[in-house]
From Swiss-Prot:
The lineage of its organism: Bacteria, Pseudomonadati, Pseudomonadota, Betaproteobacteria, Neisseriales. Belongs to the SecB family. Keywords: Chaperone, Cytoplasm, Protein transport, Translocation, Transport. Its main location: cytoplasm. HAMAP family: SecB. NCBIfam families: PRK05751.1-5, secB. One of its GO terms (cellular component) is cytoplasm. This is Protein-export protein SecB. It comes from Neisseria meningitidis serogroup A / serotype 4A (strain DSM 15465 / Z2491). Pfam families: SecB (PF02556). The gene is secB. Homotetramer, a dimer of dimers. One homotetramer interacts with 1 SecA dimer. The keyword Cell inner membrane does not apply.
Length: 147
């Protein structure tokens, strides 16, 4: 009787790969009034490190501007994780790397953005949850259309 190998999915390490904050118009920007317009961009990526180990990145860039002109701040965070995937079919592994891992990492990135912006003297930025499954499906459709 053959021994069936059990699938393995585990978090090996979570870490901040990159964190930057720019306040180009400080200190004058703190004296200005108005509601900032906040723009958020998110990207994900993964790479194979060695057999069974993958690095996944979630990069969040938040820009706040007054009157759609003067930048209050620009904050970029790359939250990363090393994940172990073994005995998992390639299609399922792609889904884990493109959806499950970013879902695990995003709350850490969101906290890093909020904490950094607050420590810079601005009100906290509360980022809404992201549907990484929808993003993954769009990427799959775009790749299929381009093939």
């Amino acid at each position: 009787m053959s021994e069936e190998l059990q699938p393995v999915f585990s978090i090996e390490r979570l870490y901040v790969k990159d964190l930057s904050l720019e306040v180009p118009h400080a200190p004058q920007i703190f004296l200005e009034q108005g509601e900032p317009e906040v723009d958020m961009r998110v990207s994900t990526g993964s790479q194979k490190l060695e057999d069974g180990y993958y690095n996944v990145d979630v990069t969040v860039t938040v820009t706040a501007k007054l009157d759609n002109e003067r930048t209050m701040f620009l904050n970029e965070v790359t939250q990363s994780g090393i994940f172990r995937l073994e005995n998992i079919p390639e299609e399922d592994a792609d889904l884990l790397l493109g959806v499950a891992c970013p879902n695990i990492l995003f709350p850490y990135a969101r906290e890093a953005v909020s904490g950094t912006v607050t420590r810079a003297g601005f009100p906290p930025v509360l980022l809404a949850p992201i549907n990484f499954e929808a993003i993954y499906q769009q990427q799959q459709e775009a790749e299929a259309a381009g093939a």
